[in-house]
Amino acid sequence: MARTVPAPRTRRVDRGGDGARASGPAPTLRIVETRVLRGPNYWAREPVVRMLVDLGVLEEYPSDKIPGFNDALIALLPTLEDHACSLGRRGGFITRLRDGTWAGHVAEHIALEFQILAGTDVRHGKTRGAGPVGQYNCIYEYREEQVGLEAGRMAVRLVNYLVAPDDPEFFFDFAPELERLIRIAERQAFGPSTQALIDEAVSRDIPFIRLDRHSLVQFGHGLYQKRIRATMTSLTSAIGVDIASDKSLTNQLLDSAGLPVPRAEVVDTEDAAIAAARRLGFPCVVKPLDGNHGRGVHLDLQSEDAVRAAFSGAVRESRSGDVIVETYVAGNDYRCLVIGGKVAAIAERVPASVTGDAEHTVRQLVEIANSDPRRGIGHEKVLTRIKLDDAAEALVRDQGYGIDDVVPDGTRVKLALTGNMSTGGTSIDRTIEAHPDNVEIAETAAQIVGLDVAGIDFICPDIATPVRETGGAIVEVNAAPGFRMHTHPTEGEPQYVARPVIDLLFPSGSGARIPIIAVTGTNGKTTTVRMVAHILKLMGRRVGMTSTDGIVVDGRLIRKGDMSGPRSAQMVLQNPKVDTAVFEVARGGILREGLGYDRNDVAVVTNVTGDHLGLGGITTIGQLANVKGVVVEAVPRSGTAVLNADDHYVYRMGRHCAGRVVLFSMSTIKGEDGFDRVDGHTSRGGAAFCLETSTEGELIVLRLGSRTMPVLYTHLIPATFGGRARMNVANALAAAAAAWAAGAHLHDIRQGLRTFSTSFFQAPGRLNLLEVGGVRVVIDYCHNVDGMRQLADFVNRMMVEPQTKAGRIGPTKGGTRTGRAIGVLGIPGDRRDDDQREYGAIAAGAFDEIIVREDKNLRGRQPGETAGNVIDGVRTAKGEGAARVARFDKVLEEMSAVRTALRRAVPGDLVVCCVDDAIAVYREAMSAAGQSRGGTAFTDPGELQAPEG
């Protein structure tokens, strides 16, 4: 429905400059809806935010008509100069701004720039009209979801502020707001070690899934998956981690192996710590038994008083309450990173410090050091900001200075005792300088503790000389060591330490991706998905399947309900049993969130018709085809798109496929579009699955270039009811093509199709045929106009006495009907009025009696409104003489309608139930027949749930 735009309101706004006051519009930009599209989607291949905005009166005010707006925006965000926009050159957006562009477009660019300023590299965006006057879809790329969403909200607020900077209601404090966004980005971003591993995996085309808001990440899909948490991996030994977290045990094991370690004792009281220090001798070290990141570590303690003070700090950081007292080893601090038993990098860690200049205080020197753009909060950047906490202030006092004292020129003041990067330390790469003896000691230490990735901390005078000669020791072994000091050393060459970790997880020749077959279209998706999954399962594949009925993994239902969206796809890709994924991809999921993965190896599009028009901003079949076409655009060069040659919109999708195209077609007559398209495609060496007719029946064949290979007669496929269910003939063609593209041989396809039926337990709610006291009952989920057209054709064929020849049933449509066809019909309330009427009109030509019901979810309609539209269609068709229906009425409650139909039916009749709750109808039919419902692959049909439209 079009929105009525109010008359423009103006306000007096002080625009600065020469002091003049100018008339400007009201700040009426507002967000109507926001969607996060996490995979390939209708708007872009990359993850984007779709922000639907309403300009209000700003629709009449492009940027060049708002006094002072452009100059104020550029003054706040001069880096907008880098935006090329549609002009394709630097400064392009500024040109558009000065020429006049609309507020939605401006908000899009501001949202991108805010993210860039927060440290996120994003570039792509676009703004398009959304239909109603003044409403626009602002599409912009994001990396971190919360950052992208907040950037959009801030962009809208900033636009309104710049439109009316004197209005306190719209005040926008730029610097604090940007700082807040930066903090959000810091919290959401991966740490540098995790990000290094992700970057390396992505460079090898290994997909990743973030499993929590921290550092738990899955690399690979299905049975190939591996996990990391920071730098711990799926291969990391739990015992090894336990040993490394117990510093005393680590020390004992290394000492038993003859490796150099300091003498140490574990204590749990202050007095015990002092006694241990006396035995070990001064200077000594006090540290938590199970601490990390250097917290609570006190070095070079020279007296009992120092030990007493250090104990209280160490015990606070100890989870167990135990503390280690050990001999102090003098020297430099080195971290040896061991990956897969080999040293990958060595860094010298330099504790945080500042150097006096005879001008600034210690506090000011720290502020100067923290202004280095390489320093950030936590692991945000390559260096961490130095904190002036109590420990740092105490250390400064120990050196004879106060925190606000001016330090003599050239005097170095330590701010931390350890060289941990997390306390503001710096690093120097020493990888190529390390002596082979020291390298061997580090590798042995990692093997003894039992870690695939380990950080071995050496204290020694020089890593370039053997520690056994110079007097050094291993003071700690770390599980999950940080990579930042190696990938971004303050001095020296960076070491690409993520590479050997990924080599460890995915050795050369190992897989990371499982085949993904994605099926979309208006009708036939669910049955096609089931057919493909059935074929592949018979080949021995462990298939993970999603559909509108649920998620099935290796033949077992693990989640019931409508599971045709991206989150369900993610569930399958995270399942370690699955080696092949077959996904039903619904229109709604693509529009709401995009695909649940980055690409599919096989994309199948069954058809595109006018169902769901008017929903989600999609108003034409062309737009709907673009939505369905997302799966085709997600096909890589090595993949395949399986397209319906009989459908003009689907056939055209082949132009957007990076891989090969396999067609399927029901057309058998030269001159028909589908037949001619297949002819042209195969003449160019392409492949197609199509039909050929002969005296023996209707045959599915594979045409591959000039060759034609027989697959299977359609009447031998149980799901086609002897070839009379033409929709399932089309679905079988699509499934055969998809399975072939996924690596199935023709004999696999034959076996799969010959053993696939539409029984309730193999395909619930999809053309299930039951016998109830001589009455044939069909349960189906026919919910749109094209589906009714196909169902009507099926009913007409089923009501005619079949012709048989050579053991086959012919797909006969003409002839004399036997018995009556009674239909229980319903269409979702969110379909257009005209579609609901057409649905009824088509049904009127196939059924002798029609009972119209409604879904429980009326989708915004009044009770009886949808049924009334269907009845109007039936009545119109009957009035025009285009109907065979003799009786039609409304019974709105679904089960009451089904019971009414079953009561009216007599032996020989066909009752077709187009219902929302297929399980309840099945139970009712079985109850009427007095039959048992047990003895099937499912314990009870209640394990299933009828799909939602």
Task: Indicate where each model-derived feature is located.
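ATP-dependent carboxylate activation and anion-phosphoryl transfer catalytic cores
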Residues: 2-203, 342-345, 350-364, 391, ...
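ATP-dependent carboxylate-amine ligase
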Residues: 25-27, 31, 37-69, 74, ...
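Conserved N-proximal alpha/beta basic substrate-recognition cap immediately N-terminal to
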Residues: 133, 139-279, 292
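Residue-level signal for inorganic ion chemistry
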Residues: 201, 457, 546, 584, ...
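Active-site nucleotide/adenylate-binding loops and adjacent lid/helix of ATP-dependent enzymes
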Residues: 225-387, 436
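Walker A (P-loop) phosphate-binding motif
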Residues: 231, 508-557
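Flexible active-site lid/hinge loop adjacent to a nucleotide/diphosphate
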Residues: 557-678, 716-721, 785-789
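Adenine nucleotide phosphate-binding catalytic loops in nucleotide-utilizing enzymes
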Residues: 617-625, 629, 639, 659-789, ...
